[in-house]
Amino acid sequence: LGHDIEASWLLCEAAEALGESDSIRGLALKIASAASEGLAGDGSLFYEKDDAAGHFDRDRHWWVQAEAVVGFLNAWQLSGDSGWLELASDALDYILQNISDPVNGEWHWSIRADGTINLDDDKAGFWKCPYHNG
């Protein structure tokens, strides 16, 4: 689901660079809508879901939450629908309340499906870079 919401805004950036912004708007909103089906009641976006394989990872990874903010803001900019703005705000609230570590800094890698903080994976490392949460 993280890659889906990420794709919704990256496609817009690519289309804009090619001068094709209008042609991608509807598709970007459809992708954002599909990704939003993976939202939890607390405003977070689950990591990934593959219906064909019967796989549903309900962890909340740091980068997926960051991409949710950007993707839902982009959907709001494209559509003017304030519902997207609310989803972006909810995702940001989730980051601030659960992913961000105000005591020791940085963002936790993830919140597990059971609601506990994942302390096993790096808080800072190769995959954590300005691309997603800078």
Predicted regions and their residues:
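Glycan-recognition and catalytic cores of secretory/periplasmic carbohydrate-active enzymes
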Residues: L1-G134
